[in-house]
């Protein structure tokens, strides 16, 4: 059967989310019969495969594909070569998608052949109804917390540097190739940069909406931000054009603390400079926490104050580590 849209969903131990994700794909306004849905799995040791195969027995166009490389960029490439559909939509198992998500993505590509990737707004949901899960969801709406990415805070259609869970015409894959398989994270940053360099545009449409489940604990949030930061460090050797100012601010913050602390041990004036910088940061932290808590509830004031610092430091420290561990990527294409 000839499908019009290849839907690629990378997974690894997603038994808690994959059924809801597949249900949101099945319920799309875009004709489900025209979709080739591929769950490309990196070796899950939970019930992910069992759940997907149950869906596959009910729907002939849902299939499970093994990903020996485990990481998401490899999953994307496997999905692309296993389908002939002219449009490719890369979804995330951790997310749900509004009923018209795929329909509007495909319409965006069909309306302008210069668009190489189209996506939309990502609403952050708490993993569960705990204090830290809700705090993390609130933090993701703060410019101070995460930065100013259009897909988090944008309200107007625009051409941007990147979008999550994007849709691509197959011609993009044929022209620029697949995602880099040596990047476990930030592969989308590098891929979107390559798309733009090839003459295509990346389009953000706020009417295209997905909902993503944030990490449930402070530790899990810090681990995720550390990994995200490490991937930015790797991009120094791969494609510096895909790194924006918002990616660099946590690095500058952490380097400032480290250098300031070292200099303070030898030169007294740097003690005051370090303290002044930290006071300024924590003042901004408190103001951002206060404003968010005023809107969402005062019980979030202290958790937000703590989480802002922890995720910023984790991201910045991860970037430093990534800068040193990413040297092996320097000469790879």
Label for each model-derived stretch:
Residues 1-27:
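N-proximal low-complexity "stem/linker" segments adjacent to membrane-targeting elements
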Residues 88:
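Short aromatic/hydrophobic "clamp" motif used to bind/position activated sugar donors
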Residues 100-134, 138, 209, 213:
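Conserved donor NDP-sugar-binding/catalytic core segment of glycosyltransferases
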Residues 67-83, 104, 160-163:
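Glycine-rich, basic loop-to-helix element that forms the pyrophosphate-binding segment
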Residues 41-50, 69, 92-96:
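A conserved acidic beta->alpha catalytic loop
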Residues 124, 146-171, 184, 190, ...:
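A recurrent flexible, glycine/aromatic-enriched loop bordering the glycosyltransferase active site
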Residues 180-243:
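Catalytic donor/gating beta->alpha subdomain of glycosyltransferases that bind UDP-sugars
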Residues 3-6, 36, 190:
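Cell-envelope/extracellular polymer assembly enzymes that use nucleotide-activated donors
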């Amino acid at each position: 059967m000839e499908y019009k849209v290849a839907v690629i969903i990378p997974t690894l131990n997603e038994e808690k989310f994959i059924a809801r994700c597949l249900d949101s794909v099945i319920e799309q306004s875009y004709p489900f019969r025209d979709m080739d849905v591929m769950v490309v799995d990196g070796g899950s040791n939970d019930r992910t495969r069992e759940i997907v195969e149950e869906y596959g027995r009910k729907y002939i166009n849902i299939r499970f594909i093994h990903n020996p490389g485990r990481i998401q960029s490899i999953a994307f490439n496997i999905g692309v070569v296993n389908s002939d559909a002219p449009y490719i939509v890369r979804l995330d198992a951790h997310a749900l998608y509004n009923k018209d998500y795929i329909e509007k993505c495909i319409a965006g590509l069909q309306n302008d052949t210069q668009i190489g990737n189209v996506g939309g707004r990502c609403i952050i949901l708490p993993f569960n109804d705990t204090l830290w899960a809700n705090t993390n969801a609130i933090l993701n709406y703060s410019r101070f917390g995460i930065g100013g990415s259009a897909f988090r805070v944008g309200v107007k259609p625009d051409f941007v540097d990147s979008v999550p869970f994007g849709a691509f015409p197959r011609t993009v894959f044929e022209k620029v190739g697949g995602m880099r398989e040596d990047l476990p994270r930030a592969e989308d940053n590098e891929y979107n940069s390559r798309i733009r360099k090839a003459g295509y545009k990346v389009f953000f449409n706020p009417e295209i909406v997905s909902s993503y489940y944030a990490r449930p604990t402070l530790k899990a949030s810090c681990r995720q931000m550390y990994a995200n930061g490490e991937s930015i460090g790797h991009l120094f050797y791969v494609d510096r054009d895909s790194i924006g100012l918002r990616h660099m601010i946590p690095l500058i913050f952490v380097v400032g603390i480290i250098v300031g602390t070292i200099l303070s041990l030898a030169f007294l004036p740097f003690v005051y400079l370090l303290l002044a910088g930290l006071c300024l940061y924590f003042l901004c932290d408190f103001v951002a926490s206060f404003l968010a808590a005023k809107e969402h509830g005062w019980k979030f004031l202290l958790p937000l104050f703590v989480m802002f610092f922890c995720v910023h430091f984790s991201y910045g420290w991860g970037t430093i580590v990534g800068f040193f561990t990413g040297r092996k990527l320097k000469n790879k294409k």
